[in-house]
């Protein structure tokens, strides 16, 4: 009877499940992958796209003082062809140039056109001041059918000076203008190249013509070059425009004896603006700070893959269409194989048997925190998130996107338009430089994101380690690590006890005596799997030896007492 009681008690003891607490992290079967410095395609719980690909096909002008130049070219606002009459003076912080816009009416070109265009794009608008030039002995009303209003006319801001009579003498003249303003003045003038020598003589008289312009920082002489050219707008002549920025209190002087297109008013820049070239429709219902020829880029991302020539407060252009920034930890979802393994192991080791490493594996459904606990005890099983470690990781990860933006965003200016023959070389250099910058920034972007991803994954693993160490230091000798991110507790630990472990208020001294007793009992019956077979064979051999000894002893006694006779025949 006593033997039966002992066997039942031992069986009952072995069947009791040990209380256990495990640590893990959130997992989600989402397929979100990022690249790090050392590995590509690492799946993470959360990630944010850093490359903008969405374009608004409109010019978002809400909240901006916008001017749409329409048929007027930006440079035309300085010299005043008929199509620019309404834009001779304006104020704006967003200037829109259209493809149909034209800077001139009489054929010609601007010297250093792109520099002048950049100045005007950033000008904030134009205001003008009369230069006060008066003329005697010449006509100031030169006009052409190429610049028609109701009839033949000329540039509104320029004077075409002609001899008083056809073939008449053009007197030598000198005119001066002093800039009395506090800001630089934009001064522009023209040189007329007649369609023939005969035409030049008719307009300005015979002899060589020379125009000289000088200031404290500028000096240049110009000689007209008459001759036949292909007709444009019915004209075989050309007018080339030149310009300078005149400092405050400086004086510009003009000396000429014909073929001179004189300025009438000096231009002053109003402030700051953004100039764009686009045929996209204006939209006053949306706001934007980054523009390109196809519309507006509205994004708070650090990179964009829409247009390499976007201007304004824009994300950096990169060649990559996607660069994912990790904002969560490494993800190991509970796939079907994992769940089948979990079910199989639960039969042997309970709820937590499937966990093969608390950093490498996660739990789906832990949505209220990144890190958490699972426990089992006499009251059942439970899961709880750890908010402190979660918040610590989030605080360090939050702002990664903003830091990338700070490293990459800046105001871009558009250096792009038509170049004359000499400026084409400059244009090629600009384009080559731009392409090189794109290559560099595409590499930099990939590197920056990879560095941040590496840091994020290392950081989240580090927080997991901290949480694990916190639990281990609390439990001390009252529990044993099982190597799978779990602790087997050697005393009864109810839900309040489990909560104290999670809250870092666990008192290991309170349970020490019970834990030591249970540890001794458990250690006494624990057998390492490597010695089980040896012990079994030893036990079997000892049993056989004992059985043989008893049998031989009984036989010897029986023979001695005459109860058994042994006959040996030879």
From Swiss-Prot:
Residues with lipidation of kind S-palmitoyl cysteine: 566, 569
Lineage: Viruses, Riboviria, Orthornavirae, Negarnaviricota, Polyploviricotina
Name of the protein in its database record: Hemagglutinin
Keyword Translocase among UniProt keywords: no
Keywords, alphabetical: Clathrin- and caveolin-independent endocytosis of virus by host, Clathrin-mediated endocytosis of virus by host, Disulfide bond, Fusion of virus membrane with host endosomal membrane, Fusion of virus membrane with host membrane, Glycoprotein, Hemagglutinin, Host cell membrane, Host membrane, Host-virus interaction, Lipoprotein, Membrane, Palmitate, Signal, Transmembrane, Transmembrane helix, Viral attachment to host cell, Viral envelope protein, Viral penetration into host cytoplasm, Virion, Virus endocytosis by host, Virus entry into host cell
Entry PTM: Palmitoylated. In natural infection, inactive HA is matured into HA1 and HA2 outside the cell by one or more trypsin-like, arginine-specific endoprotease secreted by the bronchial epithelial cells. One identified protease that may be involved in this process is secreted in lungs by club cells.
GO biological process: clathrin-dependent endocytosis of virus by host cell; fusion of virus membrane with host endosome membrane; fusion of virus membrane with host plasma membrane; viral budding from plasma membrane; virion attachment to host cell
Signal sequence bounds: 1-18
Membrane topology: Single-pass type I membrane protein
Residue intervals on the Cytoplasmic side: 555-570
Cysteines joined through disulfide linkages: 22-486, 60-286, 72-84, 105-147, 290-314, 493-497
Function summary: Binds to sialic acid-containing receptors on the cell surface, bringing about the attachment of the virus particle to the cell. This attachment induces virion internalization of about two third of the virus particles through clathrin-dependent endocytosis and about one third through a clathrin- and caveolin-independent pathway. Plays a major role in the determination of host range restriction and virulence. Class I viral fusion protein.
Entry's transmembrane regions: 534-554
């Amino acid at each position: 009877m006593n033997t039966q009681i002992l066997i039942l008690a031992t069986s009952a003891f072995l069947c009791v499940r040990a209380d256990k607490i495990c640590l893990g992290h959130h997992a989600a079967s989402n397929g979100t992958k990022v690249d790090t410095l050392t590995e590509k395609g690492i799946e993470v719980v959360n990630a944010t796209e850093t490359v903008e690909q969405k374009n608004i096909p409109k010019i978002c002008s809400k909240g901006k003082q916008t001017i749409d130049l329409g048929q007027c070219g930006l440079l035309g606002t300085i010299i005043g062809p008929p199509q620019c009459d309404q834009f001779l003076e304006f104020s704006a912080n967003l200037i829109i140039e259209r493809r149909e816009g034209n800077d001139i009416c009489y054929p010609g070109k601007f010297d250093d056109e792109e520099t002048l265009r950049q100045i005007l794009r950033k000008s904030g608008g134009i205001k003008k001041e009369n230069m006060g030039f008066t003329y005697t002995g010449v006509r100031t009303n030169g006009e052409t059918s190429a610049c028609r209003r109701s009839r033949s006319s000329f540039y509104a801001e320029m004077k075409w000076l002609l001899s008083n009579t056809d073939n008449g003498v053009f007197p030598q003249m000198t005119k001066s203008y002093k800039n009395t303003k506090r800001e630089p003045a934009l001064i522009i003038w023209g040189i007329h190249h007649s369609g023939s020598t005969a035409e030049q003589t008719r307009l300005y008289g015979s002899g060589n013509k020379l125009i000289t312009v000088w200031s404290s920082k500028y000096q240049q002489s110009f000689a007209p070059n008459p001759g036949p050219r292909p007709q444009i707008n019915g004209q075989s002549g050309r007018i080339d425009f030149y310009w300078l920025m005149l400092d405050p209190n400086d004086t510009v002087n003009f000396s000429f004896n014909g073929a001179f297109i004189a300025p009438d008013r000096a231009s002053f820049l109003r402030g700051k603006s953004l100039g764009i070239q686009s045929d996209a429709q204006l939209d006053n219902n949306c706001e934007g700070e980054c523009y390109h020829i196809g519309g507006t880029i509205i994004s708070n991302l650090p990179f964009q893959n829409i247009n390499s020539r976007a201007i304004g407060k824009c994300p950096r252009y990169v060649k990559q269409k996607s660069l994912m920034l990790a904002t969560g930890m490494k993800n190991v979802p509970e796939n079907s194989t994992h769940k089948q393994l979990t079910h199989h192991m639960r039969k042997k080791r309970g709820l937590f048997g499937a966990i093969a490493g608390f950093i490498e594996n996660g739990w789906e459904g832990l949505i209220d925190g990144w890190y958490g606990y699972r426990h089992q005890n006499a009251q059942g099983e439970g899961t709880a998130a750890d908010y402190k470690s979660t918040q610590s990781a989030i605080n360090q990860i939050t702002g990664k996107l903003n830091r990338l933006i700070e490293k990459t965003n800046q105001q871009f200016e558009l250096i792009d338009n038509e170049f004359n023959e000499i400026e084409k070389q400059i244009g090629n250099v600009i384009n080559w430089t731009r392409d090189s910058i794109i290559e560099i920034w595409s590499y930099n972007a990939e590197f920056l994101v990879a560095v941040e991803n590496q840091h994020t994954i290392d950081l989240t693993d580090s927080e997991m380690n901290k949480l694990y160490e916190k639990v281990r230091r609390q439990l001390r000798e009252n529990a044993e690590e099982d190597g799978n991110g779990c602790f087997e507790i050697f005393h009864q630990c109810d839900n309040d006890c489990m909560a104290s472990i999670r809250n870092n208020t666990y008192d290991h001294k309170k349970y020490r005596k019970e834990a030591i007793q249970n540890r001794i009992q458990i250690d006494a019956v624990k057998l390492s799997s490597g010695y089980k077979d040896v012990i079994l064979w030893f036990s079997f051999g000892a049993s056989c030896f004992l059985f043989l000894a008893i049998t031989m002893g009984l036989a010897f006694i029986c023979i001695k007492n005459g109860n058994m006779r042994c006959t040996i025949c030879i």
